[in-house]
Design a protein with these regions (language model features):
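Polybasic, proline/glycine-rich intrinsically disordered low-complexity segments
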Residues: 10-12, 57-100
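N-terminal low-complexity, intrinsically disordered segments
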Residues: 1-31
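Acidic, low-complexity, intrinsically disordered interaction modules
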Residues: 32-76
């Protein structure tokens, strides 16, 4: 099982599977230290405290993707902390067994 952190989700990340999307409260957000980063934007990665990694991810059954969905607009260039009025909505994407 691999646990990822990303700033977006694409249907191209999964071959024909059922998906479960769960919105997380601030208390339930993951510890980013143990996650594989697939955050493709440098400023978003800096704010989240993870390395920027423009990698292709194909999720498999048992994998989990934690999506940090930016709220408030685009981050200013070179941003390393969240500006006032910005935040992240956290969503856990879980891959279920194959659909036939």
């Amino acid at each position: 099982m691999t646990r990822y952190i990303g700033n977006a989700f694409s249907l191209g990340m999964v071959p024909r599977h059922l998906l479960a999307f769960v919105r997380l409260s601030a208390c339930d957000r993951p510890d980013v230290v143990d996650l594989v980063s697939c955050v493709g934007h440098a400023d978003t990665a800096a704010v989240l405290g993870v390395p920027m990694a423009r990698i292709s991810v194909t999720l498999q059954p048992g994998d989990v993707l934690y999506v940090a969905q930016l709220r408030g607009g685009r981050l200013p260039e070179g941003c390393v902390t969240l500006p006032e009025g910005f935040g992240f909505d956290w969503i856990r994407v879980e891959i279920e067994p194959s659909v036939r």
